[in-house]
């Protein structure tokens, strides 16, 4: 099919998808944003996640997102596809329903009565009357006969309300609870206020200041406080406040609202309003579309079907949302930020709303590959976080949050450094990394290293010292120590220091149980915990079981292969993940958590792609000389576990991680070990992909005979030369060139099988490492 007809078909189908009739005119230019479905993954619930996403109407990495709100105030599931009522249109900063929101407020048009209550003002809607795009949202509110449209910039937005003929048309502004302020300024057609609502991770002086300007004079003003609406009042400060302003409207009359906000001040919010300029609504919509197309056009894929295009660009879109900008541009044009760590307004970048336990795996490597200049700003923001709080973040929203395990800020920082994204203050970076290995945050135990005293002395976090998820912590700390070793080597640190982190990087060996060939929690006395079930979720592990976590040796798969008795045994254990039925032990949680249910319903054995610990596992076949098995299972995952619809994911999307996995895998490679410059090969999904790098170079990936049957790599060339390695190097890709794949329906069992074809492993590729041993102590004798 010609490319032109593909785009025409895509646009027509997308317009029907969002409930708008297809139009005859088609933009012949490359228009990838029209493939994006912001509703992908929104058909989720507490019991079962198909993404746990909401339609984020935003700019890439925007400080504010906007979303229609179907859930009640404070509900983490703020938009659910199965809902049939909208309560408002919310400025949101929520990265996950489990983390929830902060600084949010909502706007809602109503007709007839000035209803402020979120249930009474709610309106029925239909997805047939809804258009959701990355840069624009439109919906018909049947209860009020009002069409609401919105478009965002980074820190501002514009609404366009189309009202019916009515003498009692209103707009509600809800500053939500937990302490808020509102003021109506009718002589300026303006409302100002602030929201202090949050879910943690903020200083005492936290506020989100907002300014709303209307283009129609008010005929009605009221404010809400203390559960009552007070007509004629213009200002309120209380736990939960808001405002209602009204107009007389003609049929089809349009009212615009300009909105901007700031975490710094009302004055800064007014400065942020300038992002809208003097453009009208339609011009701003087009500018937003252009911004998204500029970013999404960095990768052009061809030779797939419509669902694959939709899925790819929807995942690409999700990969460009988090971490969000938490900085602003002041009146002098300087980059400044309100610190969510110490409450001060300080110079420099700040980003937030991401959990590194999830996103170190592929989201940040994707940014290093495709948007290194943006990630440079993010890295500077991490340095600022350390300066302002004494720790690098592990889960930030907006400040430190108590969630998940690991010290994976080390991976984020080191992977960027190794791929040429280098901060100016390397001394502070290294100092912060070392500090994190020897300390834990005094109030947020997931920041720094909980159990570092045991880990640094024994070589593992014991099972029986009342530190949960101890085996998971040990495995991740070992990988994190390898990351630190990588940058210490680059910085020329002393040999004694290098050897310390090299030995700690081998600490994963301390948890390997040769009887089960799996990782297992270990008691302080050096004996393995008992009884042991590889199917038990949680306990020694994090949101998974031993079958999932035993592969968390990102930096040294060959070391794990050696522990398991060689490549054949290793492959047998990989195979077992798919062969074992989706059995589980949920006794640690006292019930089935959603991650367990997501594994069982996907019918792929004990492979749990809906959560992060195992997402790299399939690529490990490459290290054992059987890359064709990776090629098979990767296509299975892409075909069976991703769709472009509301049930599009097989678990939590998690701030770009599960989406970036798909984008990488569809291109044919994946960063198994962030901190190296290598990407491990899978097999491409499309017949052609063209990557446009920031440095101006282009990489073309050709697989002309790719199909749903031709999923195996028969042969491969890179810039015309035969290529047998099971990995690609970042620096080689960045130079641009052409990769040609010849695909077939049968595996080539003679390609990628030699030692020189294997990807990086710490114990093989680094001199002298095989002579080192992990930190360890001998088991103490049992008392009689």
Locations of the language-model features?
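Bacterial Sec-dependent N-terminal signal peptides
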Residues: 1-26, 778-782
């Amino acid at each position: 099919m010609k490319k032109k007809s593909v785009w025409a078909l895509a646009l027509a189908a997308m317009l029907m998808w969002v409930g708008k009739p297809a139009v005859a005119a088609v933009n012949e230019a490359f228009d990838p944003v029209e493939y994006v479905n912001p509703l992908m993954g929104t058909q989720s619930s507490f019991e079962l996640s198909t993404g746990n996403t909401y339609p984020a109407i935003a700019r890439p990495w925007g400080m504010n997102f906007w979303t229609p709100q179907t859930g009640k105030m404070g509900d983490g599931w703020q938009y659910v596809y199965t809902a049939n009522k909208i309560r408002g249109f919310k400025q949101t900063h929520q990265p996950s329903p489990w983390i929830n929101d902060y600084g949010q407020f909502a706007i809602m048009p109503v007709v007839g009565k000035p209803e402020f209550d979120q249930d009474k003002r709610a309106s029925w809607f239909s997805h047939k009357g809804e258009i959701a795009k990355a840069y624009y949202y439109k919906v018909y509110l049947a209860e009020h006969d009002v069409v609401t449209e919105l478009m965002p910039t980074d820190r501002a937005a514009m609404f366009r309300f189309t009202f019916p003929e009515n003498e009692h048309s209103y707009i509600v502004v809800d500053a939500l609870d937990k302490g808020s302020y509102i003021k109506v300024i009718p002589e300026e057609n303006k409302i100002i206020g602030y929201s202090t609502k949050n879910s943690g991770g903020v200083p005492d002086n936290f506020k989100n200041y907002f300014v709303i300007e209307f283009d129609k004079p008010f005929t009605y003003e009221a404010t809400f406080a203390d559960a009552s609406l007070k007509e004629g009042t213009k200002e309120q400060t209380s736990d939960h406040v808001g405002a209602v302003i009204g107009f007389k409207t003609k049929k089809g009359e349009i009212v615009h609202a300009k909105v901007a906000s700031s975490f710094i001040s009302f004055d800064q919010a007014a400065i942020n309003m300038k992002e809208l300029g003097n453009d009208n609504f339609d011009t701003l919509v087009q500018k937003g579309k252009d911004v998204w197309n500029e970013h999404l056009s960095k990768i052009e894929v061809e030779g797939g079907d419509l669902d694959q295009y939709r899925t790819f660009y929807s995942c690409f879109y999700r990969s460009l949302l988090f971490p969000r900008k938490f900085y602003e541009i002041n009146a002098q044009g300087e980059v400044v930020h309100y610190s969510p760590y110490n409450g001060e307004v300080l110079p420099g970048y700040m980003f937030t709303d991401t959990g590194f336990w999830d996103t170190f795996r592929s989201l940040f490597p994707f940014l290093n590959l495709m948007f290194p200049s943006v990630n440079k700003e993010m890295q500077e923001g991490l340095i600022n976080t350390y300066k302002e709080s004494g720790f690098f973040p592990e889960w930030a929203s907006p400040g430190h949050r108590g969630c998940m395990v690991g010290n994976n800020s080390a991976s984020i920082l080191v992977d960027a450094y190794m791929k040429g994204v280098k901060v100016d203050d390397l001394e502070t970076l290294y100092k912060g990394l070392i500090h994190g290995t020897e300390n834990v945050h005094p109030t947020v135990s997931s920041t720094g290293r909980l159990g570092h005293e045991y880990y640094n002395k024994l070589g593992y976090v014991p099972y029986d010292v009342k530190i949960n998820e101890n085996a998971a912590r040990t495995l991740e700390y070992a990988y994190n120590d390898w990351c630190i070793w990588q940058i210490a080597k680059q910085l020329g640190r002393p040999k004694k220091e290098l050897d310390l982190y090299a030995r700690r990087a081998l600490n994963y060996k301390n948890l390997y149980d040769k009887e089960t060939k799996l990782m297992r929690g270990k008691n302080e006395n050096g004996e393995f915990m008992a009884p042991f079930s590889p199917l038990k979720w949680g306990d020694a592990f994090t949101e998974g079981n031993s079958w999932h976590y035993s592969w968390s040796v990102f930096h040294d798969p060959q070391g794990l292969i050696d522990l398991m008795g060689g490549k054949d045994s290793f492959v047998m254990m990989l195979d077992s993940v798919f062969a074992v039925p989706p059995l589980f032990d949920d006794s640690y949680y006292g019930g089935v958590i959603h991650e367990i249910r997501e594994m069982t319903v996907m019918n792929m054995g004990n492979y749990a792609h809906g959560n992060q610990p195992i997402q790299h596992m399939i690529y490990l076949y490459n290290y054992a000389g059987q890359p064709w098995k990776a090629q098979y299972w990767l296509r299975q995952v892409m075909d069976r576990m991703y769709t472009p619809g509301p049930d599009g994911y097989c678990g939590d999307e998690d701030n770009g991680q599960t989406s970036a996995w798909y984008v990488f895998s569809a291109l044919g490679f994946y960063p198994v070990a962030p901190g190296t410059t290598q990407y491990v090969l899978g097999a491409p999904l499309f017949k052609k992909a063209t990557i446009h790098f920031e440095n101006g170079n282009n990489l073309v990936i050709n697989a002309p005979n790719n199909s749903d049957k031709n999923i195996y790599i028969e042969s491969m060339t890179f810039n015309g030369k035969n290529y047998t390695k099971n990995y690609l190097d970042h620096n080689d890709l960045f130079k641009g060139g052409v990769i040609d794949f010849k695909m077939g329906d049968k595996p080539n069992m003679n390609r990628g099988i030699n030692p020189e074809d294997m990807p990086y492993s710490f114990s093989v590729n680094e001199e002298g490492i095989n002579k080192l041993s992990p930190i360890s102590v001998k088991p103490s004798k049992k008392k009689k």
